[in-house]
Structures are given as structure tokens and as C-alpha cells.
């Protein structure tokens, strides 16, 4: 690539990569489908609200970079990505880059889970291997952020939009992972309380049945 991408351009490329695998029957994408994919409320960070005009303008720029190709042979203009060829990387690396472009910084484990529909990685080590290769390219395509205090794992970020604010992203990652850890702890507590309630209910039923037996009362419904 001859220049860094804008956030809108990165979103468009990420959507095209994603939809190639998730909705192959409608790929390449029409403008309407592409805009809808860019503006999804789920699996997107940040959430965007792009207009047709904004997407078309970005597509023109991406076409000049050979990252997006315009399909032919259809009454509706359709678009497809060319990311792997432009960067000279395999499909597995393309899947990781797209997931980072769509969801923001993530750990290797998160990337493996989130990119499953685009590419199945055997394990987290496989993900880390492709990330290391992308990081060693010239220029680097991804960066491993420093593991922040309190964070369980280091996160990765793509560099297709240029340099990033490492300090800000590291702090944000720590807060996110700590929040995730707190949610896990709360869920474990709720499960423990649920088990305790079930045990108490079982004990009460046993006591009621024993009392009924002593009184000669039949508790079974007629």
C-alpha cells in the first residue's frame, strides 16, 4: 500500500473480507449490502453510521490502491476486496487483519474465537504465529501492545491505519479485561448461589416428605 487507510476505508475492507466468508452467495457485495455491513451494531468497534456517499467516496480511494475491485457482468455494481494480494499475505492473515479492523484490539485468544467463521485456527499458538509474521513485515501490519497492569493477556492491534496511541490502548485494554474478569467472578458467584438454593430446596423437600410420612399424608397428586 502506498499510504495508510482511513478508519472508513479499513471498515469497508474488513466488511468485504468478512462477508466473503459469511455470506458467499451474495458476495461480491452491492453498495446497499456493504453500507449495511459497515453500520452493523454488533461485532463492530467502533459502531459507525456511514452514508452511501461516504462509502462510495472511500471505495474510489480503495480502488486507486487496488484494495477494492469493482465486479462486472451484473446490473448492480458489486465490490470485492483484494487485500491478500496487495499485502502479499495468506488467507489466515487476511482473516486476522479483518477481525482487527472490525472489532479493534484483541488478544490472540479473542482473535481465534472472533475469526472462526473466516478461518479456523488449530489453536491460539497458530494465531500468534501468523500475528508474529504480520508484525515482522516491513512495514509492520500489526503490533503487540504491552500487557497493562491487571490485564491477563496482551492485545494486538492492526497498523493499516498508521501508528497507534500505545499508552491509551494499553490502559483501555486493562480496563476491558478487568471488567471481563469482574463479570466472570460475578457469574461464578451467581452459579454458586444457585447451587446453594437448589441444595436448600432439596433439603426442604426431604424434610417435608419425611414429616408427611410420619403423619401418614400422601403428597402425591391424585
Swiss-Prot record:
SUPFAM superfamilies per the record?
A: Winged helix' DNA-binding domain
Q: Return the InterPro entries for the record.
A: DUF480, WH-like_DNA-bd_sf, WH_DNA-bd_sf
Q: Which domain of life is it from?
A: Bacteria
Pfam families attached to this UniProt entry: DUF480
Q: Which HAMAP family match?
A: UPF0502
State the family it belongs to: Belongs to the UPF0502 family.
Under what name is this protein listed? UPF0502 protein Lcho_2066
Q: Which organism is it from?
A: Leptothrix cholodnii (strain ATCC 51168 / LMG 8142 / SP-6) (Leptothrix discophora (strain SP-6))
